[in-house]
Regions:
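Residues forming the flavin
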Residues: 3-53, 57-184, 188-530
Length: 530
């Protein structure tokens, strides 16, 4: 096939214009095209007020080399179709079924691959099925009554279920895992456009249905799910995993235990540390969730002409400060909501979430400051966890259990806000005005303020006085890394640390890909379970 890149078209182009552009770029006729597939679609707004839609497409034709040479198009190349392949099965035999702990993206894709290959995985998830979990989350947002086992962090689908459902990743994977993840989501009900959009997203509403469909297929392939089943202990003999304990009362023997815990399984981290599993603190970032009117972000990113024609605009900002810290946007949610993402009593964390239509009137993003083990006395593997907890306890107290909020101008002046400015907050969960100064160290607070002013150089009025900040954004990534070797095993053999909670991914797609890598390691070593 021939891949043609840099196909620029007007924002409001027709399908006929799209085909004509391809025909002209390769100097071919319509009937010569046997098959066509969009590889990438993005918005180019670098030369506002002119904005273009830019495509890369794969075109299947006869006599590819001849057509390519005749076209003289420097943006066209012959490429081979790349399909993901599962490795050959190993020779060792299982005595017991492989266990996967956690049904987030890493655990689900690990289980899916194992199930497809006949390994009959047994998945334990501390939370509930996605439909019941959603009911618990909505109840929490309405009443403030938290279920510590079923919330924004815990339950089928993982923390990403209540986010924007972003699927972009910076991970380059020559083996095609990234495309496999996207194609799998599409096969279970996600829109096909996620396979080619530059910044694909599903949205919480659709992702929930996709996750449930994926679970049903894993069950059909011989896998098993046990919900409301928290791993409370493990049995180790001769530095090998022998069994896992569920809910303090049931032991399940296994030789393979995939730890796809998620970044908020703090009690499980504590339990694992006591067993001698090697883990270490890692750098992460903390800050606030910041809201602006989406129409203003659209105008800044697209220009006045296209601000209302195009989809809700995303942004990405970053600054490296003189004090050595980085300040940057994270998990930006166009047309999104700030949500109460707490999972522990008397502690409060926030996150951002969008539905598939990104229809909220506000844009929000975490604006976060980098922290290292030096900031939280990182001598103990779980020191980052305790750092997070202290911040979340402060945030809970500041809002009396509600999301504490403040206008950016008041934050700079170190005074409590008493009302919104020209726009109000879009949240899921109750809110309360507070003074968020004192939540972080002086240096980190000044870094946040300096970063906000710096970003205003790129996005006008990013540092507007009535920008709404909500605290605390503390769960940006895992504060822990569970060490693993080149075959993905921990120092306790048979344990496979996996995904974001183990410190090897950041976001839905990279976590899913890491789940696949761990499944591949198990497949290379063992025969399917019989």
């Amino acid at each position: 096939m021939i891949r043609v890149s840099q196909l620029k078209l007007p924002v409001e182009h027709s399908e006929e214009q799209f085909y004509q552009k391809i025909e002209k770029s390769l100097k071919i006729k319509r009937d010569q095209i046997k098959k066509l597939q969009i590889v990438k679609k993005s918005i180019d707004a670098r030369k506002k007020p002119e904005v273009s839609i830019v495509y890369s497409v794969d075109v299947w034709v006869d006599k590819e080399e001849k057509i390519l040479k005749h076209s003289g198009n420097k943006n066209a190349v012959c490429v081979k179709e790349k399909k993901y392949k599962v490795p050959e099965h190993g020779t060792e035999r299982f005595n017991h079924r492989p266990v996967v702990i956690g049904a987030g993206p890493a655990g689900l894709f690990c289980a899916y691959l194992l199930a497809r290959e006949g390994y009959r995985p047994l998945v334990f998830e501390r939370g509930k099925k996605v439909v019941e979990r959603t009911e618990d989350v909505l109840h929490f947002w309405k009443t403030g009554v938290l279920n510590p086992a079923s919330n924004v962090q815990f339950g089928e689908g993982g923390a990403g279920t209540f986010s924007d459902g972003k699927l972009n990743t910076l991970v380059k994977d020559p083996l095609g895992r990234n495309r496999f993840v996207l194609d799998t989501f599409v096969s279970f009900g996600a829109p096909e456009k996620i396979t080619y959009e530059n910044k694909p997203h599903i949205g919480t509403d659709i992702l929930s249905k996709v996750i449930a469909a994926m679970r049903e297929e894993i069950l059909h392939l011989g896998g098993t799910f046990e919900f409301e089943s928290c791993v409370t202990d493990i049995r180790v003999e001769n530095q090998k995993i022998k069994a896992v304990e569920i809910n303090h009362n049931t032991w399940m023997e296994t030789e393979v235990c995939v730890l796809a815990l998620g970044h908020s399984a703090r009690d499980t981290f504590e339990m694992l540390q006591k067993t001698g599993l090697f883990m270490e603190p890692k750098a992460f970032a903390v800050g606030f969730r910041v809201e602006h009117p989406q129409k203003d972000i659209n105008r800044s990113q697209y220009g006045e002409k296209y601000a209302e024609l195009l989809e809700a605009a995303p942004y990405k900002v970053t600054a490296n400060l003189a004090n050595g810290r980085g300040v940057y946007s994270f998990c930006m949610c166009p047309g999104g909501y700030v949500v109460n993402a707490s999972s522990e009593e008397k502690r409060l964390a926030v996150n951002g979430m969008s539905y598939s239509d990104r229809g909220s009137k506000n844009a929000n993003s975490a604006i976060i400051v980098s922290v290292t083990p030096d900031d939280f006395d990182g001598t103990d593997a779980l020191s980052g966890v305790e750092f997070q907890r202290r911040l979340e306890e402060k945030a809970f107290a500041l809002g009396n259990g509600k999301i504490p909020q403040q206008l950016f101008g008041d934050y700079c002046e170190n005074k409590k806000s008493t009302g919104y400015g020209t726009f109000s907050s879009e949240t899921r969960g109750e809110t309360a005005f507070s003074n968020l100064r004192g939540l972080f160290s002086d240096e980190m607070e000044q870094s946040f303020i300096e970063g906000m002013h710096s970003f205003a150089k790129h996005i006008p009025e990013f540092d507007r006085k009535d920008a709404i900040i909500s605290g605390v954004e503390s769960r940006t990534s895992s504060p822990v890394r569970i060490r693993r070797d080149e075959v993905f095993e921990a120092n306790i053999r048979g344990i496979y640390p996996c995904g974001e909670g183990a410190g090897y991914a950041g976001g839905i797609t990279s976590a899913a890909m890491d789940g696949m890598k761990v499944a591949e390691a198990v497949i290379r070593k063992y025969q399917p379970f019989k």
